[in-house]
Design a protein with these regions (language model features):
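Active-site-adjacent structural elements that line small-molecule/cofactor binding pockets in enzymes
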Residues: 1-323
Length: 323
């Protein structure tokens, strides 16, 4: 089982907060450090010192870490135009020496769009735009050196784009698509993604989502077409401790009113987290993203590294392999 740290800096974290956690995760043997891409907290109050831009942050982390994989889980397609986004991700991939993972979704949190004047179309149009963005971004990355890329679609038009810079990873950085949508999300994941992620749901719901995406990839002939099957991953909200009191203290942020849908956290001991990871492994997950709630509580990360990672089959520093 491959284990990544997932964080939500929009709840209130500086770049330095994120750097400390990313470096500690790297030293602790976690495979990846991924972060949300939001501009406003889901909680009704708080969030100081405010949001940080995901890709600006990842560019900095790319130069200040050396082994850990870095990415978004996930970027909102409403925030950036596809041409510039392809350039941004490719450049950060170069800056990291080929350690970037590109998570992207439709965007869902209307409140942050209203706050910053970002258009927020109806959900059907957001899916249309996401699909077109995926076609454009992968098309740009697949263009041979010296070639040009054009696209004339319903929402975006590109003409003779130089398709530069090129990402360090070939054919491109791993693409992560996730979410609870039962129809278009599995189809898009099967067509474009290397990894499908269902965030922070219970095991039965996650199993149902995995079944839908596996069926979707089988319908398009994957992996018979030579592409690797999708990596299936789960997200787990984590608040564990050496004592029940310590675990409950770490779970306190979960009681703050939030716009997030209901989640299924692990609140308890390291062995309970190991058991939950095992349950996800039993339904096909080969990667988990552990959401930590407090950037200042680095002892929480140390505890997971010391008492959870050694109990997992793959051990530490497993190499990531995609088709």
């Amino acid at each position: 089982m491959r284990v990544c740290v997932f964080t939500e800096p929009h709840r209130g974290a500086t770049y330095d907060d994120q750097l400390r956690m990313a470096r500690l995760a790297e030293d602790g043997g976690f495979e990846g450090f991924l972060r949300a891409d939001h501009y406003r907290s889901m909680e009704l109050e708080g969030g100081l010192p405010g949001p940080t831009d995901a890709w600006v942050t990842l560019a900095g982390l790319a130069r200040e870490t050396s082994r850990i994989r870095l990415g978004t889980l996930v970027s909102s397609a409403t925030f950036r135009l596809p041409g510039p986004l392809a350039m941004i991700v490719a450049q950060v991939d170069q800056m990291s020496g080929g350690r970037v993972e590109f998570g992207i979704g439709t965007g869902w949190y209307e409140r942050e769009h209203i706050a910053y004047g970002i258009p927020f179309p109806p959900v059907g149009e957001r899916f249309d735009r996401l699909e077109e963005q995926l076609a454009i971004i992968t098309g740009l990355w697949a263009t041979p050196p010296g070639g040009r890329f054009s696209h004339h679609g319903k929402n975006y038009r590109l003409s003779d784009a130089p398709a530069l810079p090129r990402p360090a990873q070939r054919p491109w950085p791993p693409i992560i698509i996730g979410g609870r949508g039962p129809k278009r999300t599995p189809r898009l994941a099967a067509r474009y993604a290397d990894e499908f992620n269902l965030p922070f749901r219970n095991v039965p719901e996650t199993a149902e989502a995995f079944e839908r995406v596996v069926e979707a990839q089988e319908r398009i002939g994957r992996p018979r077409d030579g592409r690797a099957p999708l990596v299936l991953s789960a997200g787990i909200v984590v608040a564990i401790g050496r004592t029940d009191a310590e675990a409950r203290r770490r779970a306190a942020p979960l009681h703050v009113p939030s716009a997030l849908p209901p989640e299924d956290p692990v609140i308890g001991s390291p062995s309970q987290l190991v058991d939950r990871i095992g349950e996800f492994a039993a339904i096909g997950a080969t990667r988990v993203h552990l959401r930590l709630l407090d950037f200042a509580d680095l002892d929480h990360l140390d505890l997971i590294a010391a008492e959870v990672l050694p109990q997992l089959d793959s051990g530490r520093d497993a190499a990531r392999t995609y088709g």
